[in-house]
């Protein structure tokens, strides 16, 4: 309960800073392949995860100009949410350069329970929880949307009930 309350306070502070335009963004060049490999190492050492968290094989090396801390916040939110709703199968992080655009598309795909069609459009709204049994504040995905929009990208989800979900976002790529 204490952990959930601290997370709620932290999330509300982040949201207020985003709305006020005072959330700090520290921009720098980032090798996204190494960055994603580092994220995977953090999940490799967690023994209590219900399913494997994998990085798609054969991903190319790209550099983007971004805020590493905020990008990590979004990806780990996607993975942690997937872990809450995936009992069998796996969770996969991947990225690719979108054709005919200057964007990298990141995605976290799970083999979890999926999201009911009537709830898909609401997942990035504030205080939305998809069920009553999972821990969380209902603010994480709303914060993710604000971060990605600030970084110049878009965010979305594709889901099939009983099959799984793919949470994705785009990020500008200048080569």
Residue ranges with predicted function:
Residues 140, 144:
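Short alpha-helical Gxxx[C/S/T] motif in the catalytic ATP-binding
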Residues 1-5:
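Short alpha-helical segment of the dimerization/phosphotransfer core of two-component systems
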Residues 32, 114-122:
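Short helix N-cap motif at coil->helix boundaries in the Bergerat
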């Amino acid at each position: 309960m204490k952990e959930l309350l601290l997370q709620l306070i932290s999330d509300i502070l982040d949201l207020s800073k985003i709305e006020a335009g005072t959330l700090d963004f520290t921009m720098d060049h980032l090798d996204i392949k190494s960055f994603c490999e580092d994220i995977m190492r953090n999940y490799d050492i967690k023994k209590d995860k219900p399913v494997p968290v994998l990085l798609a094989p054969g991903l190319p090396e790209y550099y983007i100009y971004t805020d590493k801390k905020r990008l990590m916040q979004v990806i780990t939110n996607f993975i942690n949410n997937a872990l809450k709703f995936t009992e069998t199968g796996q969770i996969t992080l991947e990225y690719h350069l979108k054709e005919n655009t200057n964007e990298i598309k990141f995605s976290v795909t799970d083999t979890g329970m999926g999201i009911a069609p009537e709830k898909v459009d609401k997942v990035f709204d504030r205080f939305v929880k998809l069920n009553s049994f999972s821990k969380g504040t209902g603010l994480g995905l709303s914060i993710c949307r604000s971060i990605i929009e600030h970084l110049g990208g878009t965010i979305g989800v594709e889901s099939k009930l009983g099959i799984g979900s793919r949470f994705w976002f785009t990020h500008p790529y200048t080569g």
